[in-house]
Amino acid sequence: MNLLETVEQDTMPTHYKQMTQAEMIARVTEIKDQLGENLFIPCHHYQKDEVVPFADAIGDSLQLAQIAAQNKKAKHIVFCGVHFMAETADMLTTSEQVVTLPDMRAGCSMADMADIHQLTNAWPKLQTLFGDTILPVTYINSTAAIKSFVGEHGGTTVTSSNATKIVSWALEQKERIFFLPDQHLGRNTAFELGIPLEHMAIWNPIKNELEYEGNLDDCKVILWKGYCSVHQHFTVKNIENIRKNHPKMRIIVHPECTHEVVSLADDSGSTKKIVTEINNAAPGTEWAVGTEANLVGRIIQENPDKKIVSLNPFMCPCMTMNRIDLPHLLWTLEAIQNGEQRNQIKVDEQTTKFALKALERMLQLS
């Protein structure tokens, strides 16, 4: 999402913020019933509790991508997530389907850390250093333009759910991979596959240079210097506090956390894995969870028979995810009901052509 898109978005009328929760719930329910199968609302795990009850599907990035690709009925897809997710949905659905983001300010700081101009500047430098031995792999948390570049160069997208499988495949295709934009997911996945940390380099997009002290021939993974602003805030100190004060607690974290945190946790995995593992755990078990606050709160509500806390007691929700709220959802649905188009997410054909190659490779491998 660029600045122009943000400036050009429609502004929600103030009266929506003045409505009561009950009034908004009643209106959203009414419109959903009226539109029926013509409306589909996918919702990411990190969304607010006030939005989640209206979701037709709830999931992580991989689940929502798969669901979007399978849905051919709904004319209107109102995506309760962030910008790159809505872009992915637009590319995976038909040209007749319209994807809408209730608030265009719902971006992703990690996705914004990898700009297409930075990538096109980086690639020739890496080719000079390593020749044609690199396969680009991009986390699904990236812009459509980044996905398109990766697809055009034979690479694939990846999610936290399928990272081990996808990265393993990528390393069979070429001698080394260029993983972007999240260095932590890339590092944790590569390490899990047996690649030592000393064989991983950092690409600094600000300086447009490789940060690596070893022998270039030993470098197997090049990590873009990006990160999740939420998961970066889980620390080794948080884990030490849990071990000291709650020795029976099992610690599970998202692989977007730093390598130090993931290494000290009992387990790590995607939001789907975290939810499934805790839901299936025995009553009375204790958990400290290292992921986004809205999801942790929902896991606590759904598991009253277990003791569950956030690994970081001062953790905030993902603030860009939090921009999707009930007033914006209602505003969007009323526009659809009135035959108006608001905040449509549309990826151009050329970008879609190659981005789809990257997405389809991932979906086939998954």
From Swiss-Prot:
It catalyses: iminosuccinate + dihydroxyacetone phosphate = quinolinate + phosphate + 2 H2O + H(+). It comes from the Bacteria. Its main location: cytoplasm. GO terms for molecular function: 4 iron, 4 sulfur cluster binding; metal ion binding; quinolinate synthetase A activity. Pathway: Cofactor biosynthesis; NAD(+) biosynthesis; quinolinate from iminoaspartate: step 1/1. The keyword Mitochondrion does not apply. It is found in: Cytoplasm. InterPro entries: NadA, NadA_sf, Quinolinate_synth_A_type3. Iminosuccinate binds at H44, S61, Y139, I140, N141, S160, H254, P255, E256, T271. [4Fe-4S] cluster binds at C108, C228, C318. Its EC number is 2.5.1.72. Its cofactor is [4Fe-4S] cluster. PANTHER family: QUINOLINATE SYNTHASE, CHLOROPLASTIC, QUINOLINATE SYNTHETASE A. Catalyzes the condensation of iminoaspartate with dihydroxyacetone phosphate to form quinolinate. NCBIfam families: nadA, PRK09375.2-1, PRK09375.2-4. Belongs to the quinolinate synthase family. Type 3 subfamily. This is Quinolinate synthase. It comes from Listeria monocytogenes serotype 4a (strain HCC23).
